[in-house]
């Protein structure tokens, strides 16, 4: 285990205390960034809460902090430890059969890494509740964790990541027993890499990921697993370009449809054109934190 504590860092959002940590898993050093909560005292304080954000393809924890405009750092102001894990070779080994990246070829066990990371945070920081979220490949990693270790997770969220079709899912993932988890999905209708309506997903001709369900089918799948009280979701228009479908129940599911928005994390910034249109109508980190009750 290696820990490096840095002086307070001034970001576009606020001042944070950042720690770089590492642990050994599968004989490999796995690294991560921790953002400390603002008020981590009190036996029953929210500082016992961990929020893990998984980065997208060709990113790292450091890159995704900047990519998301440091907006997830702000969850530390809500009393959470925020952790950004680093994937191996800039990817996480998600559940898609079509993931043709080094992390798959190397047999990286990112589920085991997540388990070790949670144990580390429990041992060193007293974590008792764990929420997870991810973007793109990181969102796909969240979907895998929801299947394989659901009892470790108090709530999950994905951005720009539809569920892979059964034929594009690792067989071992589908064998796990269902366990309900509150879940929020966010998807743009103009996403060029993870099509809102489903189908072939990927980045360019060299990085295809196989077929996925539509955003609505993905959310409905988890609503059914959660025992939703309504088969058809209630629909609410939050703004001209944001529509929310909600399946109620003890473990609710929400699908936030971003009309005309691309493959990105809404965070009060403009993204490169190749990702599709940006939006200033919401901040994903705030929406997700509110859904989790943080």
Enumerate the language-model features and the residues they cover:
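An N-terminal hydrophobic leader/cap segment in hydrolases
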Residues: 1-22
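Serine-hydrolase catalytic machinery in alpha/beta-hydrolase-like enzymes
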Residues: 23-36, 40-41, 45-131, 140-148, ...
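Alpha-helical scaffolding within the catalytic cores
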Residues: 66-71, 166-175, 239-243
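Primarily recognizes the serine-hydrolase "nucleophile elbow" in alpha/beta-hydrolase
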Residues: 128-181
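Short beta-strand/loop motif that positions the catalytic acidic residue
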Residues: 185-187
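Acidic catalytic loop of the alpha/beta-hydrolase fold
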Residues: 190-194, 263-265
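Acidic, glycine-rich loop-and-strand cores that form catalytic or ligand-binding grooves
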Residues: 208-242
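Catalytic active-site module of serine/aspartate enzymes centered on a nucleophile-bearing elbow/loop
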Residues: 275-294
